């Protein structure tokens, strides 16, 4: 009830009747917004934060469980998958995966994102300009995070032999297996695209899968390196979408807030 409305007790009955002394469109709109907010609170829904909304808690817990199982399974099959790919290697597929992994590096994604953002700006499409720039930001976050983790973990690549151990292995690229920077960057890059437009993002999903396979086939990473990098890329994409694309996805809530 708005401030212009006043409660009035009817004599002799004890029941409360409500009377609007100032009936106006503004008064009705205020009452409608109040009742709508109460309904959203009662149902546990809101237009707000992706990370604290009650309805998303279940999906976060489910995602944590799936990620934990995937990482544990990947570590278990690390050696077996690497040995299988080495035994079934051929020259044609090796050359193909070599060129795929060249495209999957972060400079190519970075340049592609900036070019697409420039094209969208030239065409006056602010929405897609913001999406492409968000893809670049997610790529940068995932790439930097992966590189820092690489230095801290210093895991040897599958192709590294024991006799090649180096005194400064922590800063050598031969010991930067965990996690895969290529997979983290491509997952974050196309992950933002999938969250912004799932049809276009789904069409680009084979690119991410090919990049991940190429890193395994070239003995640059173990299976666990690729799986953990994909999780890092997904988290980077979710973070960027939440902070940079939320006004696009929820324009009405952005206006009201």
Where are these regions (language model features)?
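N-terminal transmembrane-helix/juxtamembrane module of multi-pass inner/ER membrane proteins
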Residues: 37, 44-113, 150-172
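Membrane-embedded catalytic cores of phosphoryl/pyrophosphoryl-handling enzymes
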Residues: 40, 53-54, 60-61, 165-257
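Membrane-interface loops
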Residues: 80-83, 125-195, 200
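Aromatic-anchored segments of alpha-helical transmembrane domains
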Residues: 68-74, 140-145, 208-220
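Cysteine-centered motifs
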Residues: 2-5, 27
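Short, basic, low-complexity termini and linkers enriched in Ser/Thr/Gly/Pro
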Residues: 10-42, 57, 248-257
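Hydrophobic, aromatic-rich transmembrane alpha-helices
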Residues: 111-120, 186-194
